[in-house]
């Protein structure tokens, strides 16, 4: 019997809470999953920092366990990629982010939101790829169709 696992860091589910629908213990040799983690929280306040920490933490853990992970920077979350893509950043989360980059995590950055949060030009100058597949935003349906 195949169990469906759903990992939600969506704003509509609550960014700070990432859930899996099964309570079973992982089995050796179990099939690896595909996860889409969406960071929509901005840099303002303790809550935004906590959500960013957990997006990076859960991405790292899933990668270490052999799962496929796509990390999406959407909404105010584009402020984080703006900070972390700056080579001169002193942000304390930047080293963890850079480790994920070394592991070749797939990153998606919302084109529309980068503009709305006034970080688009800097991201383009830093050669950060921006995605606008559905009304200026990344397509979530595309990733769902791919099993994420």
Each PLM stretch: what is its role?
Residues 1-8:
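Bacterial N-terminal signal peptides that target proteins for export
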Residues 30, 36-53, 81-85:
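Short, glycine-rich nucleotide/cofactor-binding loops
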Residues 99, 117-138:
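A short aromatic-anchored loop/beta-hairpin motif
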């Amino acid at each position: 019997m195949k169990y469906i696992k759903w990992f939600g860091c969506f704003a509509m589910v609550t960014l700070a809470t990432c859930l899996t629908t099964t309570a079973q213990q992982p089995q050796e040799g179990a099939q690896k999953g595909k996860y889409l983690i969406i960071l929509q929280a901005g840099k303002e306040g303790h809550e935004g920092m906590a959500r960013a920490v957990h997006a990076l933490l859960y991405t790292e853990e899933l990668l270490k366990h052999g799962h496929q992970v796509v990390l999406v920077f959407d909404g105010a979350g584009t402020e984080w990629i703006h900070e972390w893509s700056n080579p001169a950043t002193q942000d304390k989360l930047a080293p963890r982010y850079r480790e994920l980059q070394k592991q070749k995590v797939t990153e998606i950055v919302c084109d529309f939101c980068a503009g709305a949060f006034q970080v688009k030009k800097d991201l383009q100058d830093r050669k950060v790829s921006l995605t606008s597949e559905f009304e200026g935003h990344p397509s979530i349906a595309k990733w769902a169709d791919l099993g994420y």
